[in-house]
Each structure stands twice: as C-alpha cells, then as structure tokens.
Swiss-Prot record:
Protein species of origin: Cyanothece sp. (strain PCC 7425 / ATCC 29141)
UniProt signal peptide: none
Family that this chain belongs to: Belongs to the PsbI family.
GO BP terms: photosynthesis
Record-linked Pfam families: PsbI
Record's keyword annotation contains Thylakoid: yes
Designated name of the protein: Photosystem II reaction center protein I
Localization in the cell: Cellular thylakoid membrane
Gene Ontology cellular component list: photosystem II reaction center; plasma membrane-derived thylakoid membrane
Protein's job: One of the components of the core complex of photosystem II (PSII), required for its stability and/or assembly. PSII is a light-driven water:plastoquinone oxidoreductase that uses light energy to abstract electrons from H(2)O, generating O(2) and a proton gradient subsequently used for ATP formation. It consists of a core antenna complex that captures photons, and an electron transfer chain that converts photonic excitation into a charge separation.
Phylogenetic placement of the source organism: Bacteria, Bacillati, Cyanobacteriota, Cyanophyceae, Gomontiellales
Transmembrane parts of this sequence: 6-26
NCBIfam families (UniProt xref): PRK02655.1 (NF002735)
SUPFAM superfamilies: Photosystem II reaction center protein I, PsbI
Amino acid sequence: METLKITVYIVITFFVLLFVFGFLSGDPSRNPKRKDLE
C-alpha cells in the first residue's frame, strides 16, 4: 500500500512539473496554438 501511495505522489509531481515547465516556456511566439485555446 505504501508503494502505491509513493507512485501516486511521483506521478502527481511529474505532471505538476510538466505543467509548470510548459507554462514558463510556452510563449506565444513559439507556441501559437496556446492562444487559440484561451
């Protein structure tokens, strides 16, 4: 049960890091599709 909890925390942290890095490096000049989603 502890292994499952640790795995869940790792996956959540991984997705949070992906979101933060994508948000910081996703400027409109390099990612024009982001503006269409807003």
